[in-house]
Amino acid sequence: MIFQDKTVIITGGSEGVGAATARMFAVAGANLLLVARGKKKLEAIAEELRDKTRVEIFAMDVSDAEASVNLFKKADYEFGRVDILINNAGYHKRAPFDLAAIDELATTIDVNLRAPIVLTRLAIPHIMEAGGGAIINVGSLAGRTMVPGSTAYAASKAGLRSLTYSLAEELRGSNIKIGIVSPGPIDTGFIMDDIDAVTDLVFSQPLCTAEDVAQVVLDLCGNNVREQCMHTSSRIFTTVTYLFPRLGRTLRPLFEKKGRRVKKRLIAERKKAEREKTAK
């Protein structure tokens, strides 16, 4: 797909995968409407990119349905069209399910699943009016397999994956591409700032960068792939554990052992970097 002069809405667009995706779309010539809760971070990334393309921001909680309606009104006012929606905003409060706060569980579902459903519903007529485009969801390997300690998050990402496949079938023959990227652990604050609470199993899978995921997002906009897992080994792992859960439970201790080694190394590297930064 040629992105020049297309209008792209990116939720969670102020940092991490969202910011990396915004940078790549900007280089490709797309106009950007970046969405996040924090206005200061939005302003910072917008200022960074305005020498490359036109960028507008909209500070909002994606789980606010009324604000979502206003988001598309702003898109109409500023750009007169919407071509691409990237549902990237995510929320994850790690805790054993039986100890998780009820409001945290609700927020997880609201941000990770209900918001993309509402935003997608609002985006479709705009994208059709623009002549076609894409809706790409940022999922997770957690939506493809069992991840104890992240039950609500995994459920929300499984729902997002189901939304992707069901809607793609419903819109078959239309000019809107529906896709999802399912990465494993990503080297961003979403995981690394809470690394001690992240289950060992997560780190048994290859670590991605925000730029890795962003490139897949752009690729999915224009190819015929419905879902891109990152990486091939993770696709095999999640498929096997989903189809054969008893085998998955048997293999899990081996993967957790591997994950503990990786996690220990990452924590050590992080502490070393912090010491070096302090020394300067």
Question: At which residue positions do the language-model features occur?
Answer:
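The beta1-alpha1 cofactor-binding region of Rossmann-like NAD(H)/NADP(H)-dependent oxidoreductases
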Residues: 40, 58-70, 102
